Curated annotation (Swiss-Prot):
ATP binds at residues 17-25, 43, 129, 131, 136, 194. One of its GO terms (molecular function) is ATP binding. L-citrulline binds at residues 99, 135, 139, 192, 201, 203, 280. The keyword Transcription does not apply. It comes from Burkholderia ambifaria (strain MC40-6). This is Argininosuccinate synthase. Its EC number is 6.3.4.5. The gene is argG. Keywords: Amino-acid biosynthesis, Arginine biosynthesis, ATP-binding, Cytoplasm, Ligase, Nucleotide-binding. PANTHER family: ARGININOSUCCINATE SYNTHASE (PTHR11587:SF2).
């Protein structure tokens, strides 16, 4: 039997990831009318644009759910977000501005915790609102089957009968109104938004055009820093880490990581910190474009990276960055709990993050404009006296450096010989304006 069901399994329990929005509301009621036994599961991910989580399961029952549960995913979401930060699991950047993989982290948490809750209720069929062209359909597929190997997947948006009857938002709104729910369709935005406590994603519709910029977006986690009428005062912020964990902001210690990240969001959001415009490759290798927000993670990342560069040596930092980029791709692909991802993540958490103890003071201005004002750590290997040009006790002398430079003659000679070979076979033909050396053979040719 196929894992993916193309038609509604009537008479059986079907779990649906229920947001309370028009799409999942219409799908739930439609499944009920068609003979399935729908169960609704809502993840509390601390979405900044959701103000009443408790009302969502009640609406699901009203629309026909046989059962509805609200699953608090915030603690796990923040734990996975900090793990991603510790391992630098961010592979999408443009000119040094980073996307913090906030949606992939949210999917890892939602996909595992909701399916675990369904399994407790004896629900082994799962549906959600992801479309066949996106990343989430594969992410949820992988995470769901990891938790429940007996899981079957039913997605109304892959069921042709559902599509024929309720193929668009107007049809869904009319369907709900005719059912007596007086469902008022929200005003259409120029883009779609998905969010959690870690960050927000804005994409699709008008944002599919690269002629539309960030200015059409109304931020939900911070301010529109590009607007002249938005006044933003410079602000100094201190961030403290202990053994890789963020523990304090502006001298205030937080026992609860969720509360710390909420405060980091408020601080960064006042400046529009962490917003980025990215073109990326989806899992299926088609390119897409998104506008992202992550004010809190961006603030923590600035401080964390500063301490990484001050504490670890060059080879460790290089390995951390290479592994982080690879891990970021695995996270994006829905492989956050795969063995290769766990290996990369735990390596960074053990050998990089564990040494990260210290405090960084940052001045935030507008958007991603900031300055680092001070860096303190008992683990710093940055020792300016080693390189001071003043008369100080030194770890090495001028004579030591002469010897070190003399040893470089070996590889310089090898490099010169190799360039000569390349020149002789026509691989190097520098013009007059080239910075490449004019390599000649022993005969002067």
């Amino acid at each position: 039997m196929s894992t993916i069901l193309e038609s509604l399994p009537t008479g059986q329990k079907v779990g649906i990831a229920f947001s309370g929005g028009l799409d999942t509301s219409a799908a739930l009621h439609w499944m009920k009318l068609k003979g399935a036994v729908p169960y609704a599961y809502t993840a509390n991910l601390g979405q900044p644009d959701e103000d009443d989580y408790d009302a969502i399961p009640k609406r699901a029952i009203e629309y026909g759910a046989a059962g509805a549960r609200l699953i608090d995913c915030r603690a796990q979401l923040v734990a996975e977000g900090i793990a991603a930060l510790q391992s630098g699991a961010f592979h999408i950047t443009t000119a040094g501005v980073t996307y913090f993989n906030t949606t992939p982290i949210g999917r890892a948490v939602t996909g595992t915790m909701l399916v675990a809750a369904m399994k407790e209720d004896g629900v082994n069929i799962w549906g959600d609102g992801s479309t066949y062209k996106g990343n989430d359909i594969e992410r949820f597929y992988r995470y769901g089957l990891l938790v429940n190997p007996d899981l079957k997947i039913y997605k109304p948006w892959l069921d042709q009968t559902f599509i024929d009857e309720l193929g668009g938002r107007a049809e869904m709104s009319e369907f709900m109104n005719q059912a007596g729910f007086a469902y008022k369709m929200s005003a259409e935005k120029a883009y779609s938004t998905d969010s959690n406590l870690l960050g927000a994603t804005h994409e699709a519709k008008d944002l599919e055009s690269l002629e539309s910029g960030i200015k059409i977006v109304n931020p939900i986690m911070g301010v529109a820093f590009w607007r002249d009428d938005v006044k933003i005062a410079a602000e100094e912020v201190t961030v403290r880490f202990e053994a890789g964990q963020p523990v304090a902001l502006n001298g205030v210690e937080f026992k609860d990581p969720v509360e710390l990240l909420l405060e980091a969001n408020r601080i960064g959001g006042r400046h529009g910190l962490g917003m980025s415009d990215q073109i990326e490759n989806r899992i299926i290798e088609a390119k897409s474009r998104g506008i992202y927000e992550a004010p809190g993670l961006a603030l923590l990342y600035i401080a964390y990276e500063r301490l990484v560069t001050g504490i670890h040596n060059e080879d460790t930092i290089e390995q951390y960055r290479e592994n982080g980029r690879r891990l970021g791709r695995l996270l994006y692909q829905g492989r956050w709990f795969d063995p290769q991802a766990i290996m990369l993540r735990e390596t960074a958490q053990r050998w990089v993050a564990r040494a990260i103890t210290g405090e960084v003071k940052i001045e935030l201005r507008r958007g991603n404009d900031y300055s680092i004002l001070s860096t303190k750590s008992p683990n710093l290997t940055y020792q300016p006296e080693r390189l001071s040009m003043e008369k100080v006790a030194s770890t090495f002398s001028p004579r030591d450096r002469i010897g070190q430079l003399t040893m470089r003659n070996l590889d310089i000679t090898d490099t010169r010989d190799k360039l000569r070979v390349y020149s002789q076979v026509g691989l190097l033909t520098p013009g007059e304006s080239s910075a490449l050396p004019q390599i000649k053979g022993d005969d002067g040719k």
